[in-house]
Regions:
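N-terminal helical capping/dimerization or prosegment-like subdomains
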Residues: 29-115, 337-339, 352-353
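An extended, acidic, His-containing surface patch that forms the Zn2+-binding/catalytic region
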Residues: 97-99, 204-207, 266-329, 336, ...
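Acidic/histidine-rich catalytic neighborhood of metal-dependent amide-processing enzymes
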Residues: 132, 138-217
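A short core secondary-structure module
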Residues: 182-186, 235, 240-264
Length: 479
């Protein structure tokens, strides 16, 4: 049963499901992990076949997909649209209130996929050689399935929860999230009252080429996007008569100063901790230096070597990338206006306002206008949350040589919408991923290993149960 009310859609309890899946704690059923793992594969195949490319999004299709699964299992859900077709879905299992809520978030939109360059249909859900292909398999429809099955498994098992468990599927993350996480946090803050933690994309279980787990990475901080446009104006004219002070020339001179500017090195707590935790994985000659990265970067020779890797360089300084240039649309016309856009990423303890003043000093031309296109306030999550303790338990059980650590995310996710309201949000994909895995995110032939999906789904279910204060019953033996 569904009723539309403006941009809101409620999906009620399935009568048949309600009569069969509600169980008291005393009647808690065993868990057949093999069946759940197989269900994760089939569910992700179906989910990948729903095209939620952003733009335009059409995330309501994805929301309705989950709403049906929830209704079939006696779980009420609500879909709220920020605009027609731009759906966000929430579903909740109630606990007894002795612990705070756990929110399981993923984004339902995906980036475009050009089928000409794929070896499989980007929206076909094809399995080949043990891998499941489709746009969003990792980013983040696979996580959405693991989150949904956490909710469904807890419901079906009749387990008593201490805290609420909330499924949240949002729109628009790939375009900044204003119509997704930003919208629901602003318009429905009551959904998140009494929340202990939001689990989102970002961190991951890192594995080596042989599949051995080397660390559990929890993203507690990310760099701050600070996008600006530089605009120069001047007298237009014919290209045959150059103007030394033309808009284009002044802009190029300003950009030359920006490109030549080297921002100072700075090691934030998450980066210092990450390299200390993982130094033992590096070649032996580098281990002492990485164990105290902040001190080691004071050595110019080491700093030069370390920052020659563009990924490492981005972790220890504010970065500026020139990404767009606009001027005349004709070769023989000197434009009246020329502009450039800069993608600036600030370390999580930096102040965008202060950096803007520093940028203007570097530009050193008061005639150049600097416009802010995008800026988020700095926000991080604490490093002493229960989540870290639970993952240490898992590491001790499943990968005794692995550590739990805090990689800094160079990009940004929807976590900032929650951190800005003092709600702890952490990035943690429950999947064991390696360099090859990340190489296909936003690329051609995005895919996830079937075994990786199955194992990650179980990890998420076990993690959520722990955080919600629930004890999982013994699973049924595999056939």
């Amino acid at each position: 049963m569904s009723l539309r009310n403006g941009h809101r859609l409620w999906v009620g309890l399935g009568i048949v499901a309600a009569s069969t899946v509600f169980a008291s704690n005393a009647q808690a059923q065993t868990i057949d992990w093999t069946a759940i793992e197989n269900e994760s594969v089939a569910m992700l195949q179906d989910y990948l076949r729903i095209d939620t490319t952003n733009p335009p999004g059409n995330e309501t299709l994805g929301a309705e997909f989950f709403a049906k699964h929830f209704a079939d299992n006696g779980i009420e859900s609500q879909i709220v649209e920020s605009a027609p077709g731009r759906g966000n879905i929430i579903a909740r299992l109630r606990g007894d209130g002795s612990k705070q809520a756990v929110v399981l978030m993923h984004h339902m939109d995906v980036v475009p996929a050009d089928a000409r360059f794929w070896t499989a249909d980007p929206f076909g859900g094809e399995i080949r050689d043990g891998e499941l292909y489709g746009r969003g398999a990792i980013d983040t429809k696979g996580m959405g399935v693991a989150n949904a099955l956490a909710l469904l498994t807890l419901k079906r098992s009749g387990i008593q929860l201490a805290g609420d468990v909330i499924f949240l599927g949002v729109a628009d993350e790939e375009a900044g999230g204003k119509m997704g996480a930003g919208y629901v946090v602003k318009t429905h803050p009551e959904w998140f009252e009494g929340t202990s933690v939001v689990l989102n994309e970002g961190g991951y279980i890192a594995s080596d080429a042989d599949g051995k787990i080397v660390f559990y990475g929890v993203e507690a901080a990310q760099k701050i996007p600070f996008w600006v446009r530089l605009v120069a104006q001047g007298a237009p004219g014919h290209g045959s008569m150059p103007r030394p002070d033309s808009a284009s020339n002044r802009l190029v001179r300003a950009l030359g100063r920006v490109i030549a500017y080297e921002t100072p090195l700075r090691v934030v707590r998450e980066v210092q901790q990450f390299y200390a935790d993982t130094a033992h994985l590096a070649p032996s000659e580098l281990q002492p230096a990485l164990a105290d990265l902040r001190a080691s970067l004071a050595d110019p020779a080491f700093a030069k070597t370390f920052t020659s890797d563009i990924r490492q360089n981005a972790l220890v300084r504010n970065t500026i990338s020139l990404t767009a240039l606009r001027g005349s649309n004709k070769t023989n016309v000197i434009p009246a206006e020329a502009s450039a856009e800069l993608d600036i990423r600030l370390l999580p303890d930096q102040d965008p306002v202060a950096f803007l003043e520093e940028l203007k000093r570097v530009i050193n031309d008061d005639t150049i206008q600097v416009e802010t296109l995008l800026s988020f306030p700095a926000a991080t999550s604490p490093l002493d949350h229960e989540l870290f303790d639970v993952l240490r338990e898992f590491a001790k059980r499943d990968a005794p040589d692995a550590v739990v650590t805090t990689p800094l995310l160079g990009g940004f996710t929807d976590c900032h919408y929650f951190r800005e309201h003092d709600i702890p949000c952490y990035g943690f994909w429950p999947f064991a991923l390696n360099e090859q895995s990340f190489g296909v995110v936003h690329g051609n032939d995005e895919r996830i290993g079937v075994d990786v999906l199955k194992a990650g789904t179980r990890t998420m279910i076990e993690l959520v149960a722990k955080l919600a204060g629930a004890t999982l019953p013994n699973h049924a033996p595999s056939p």
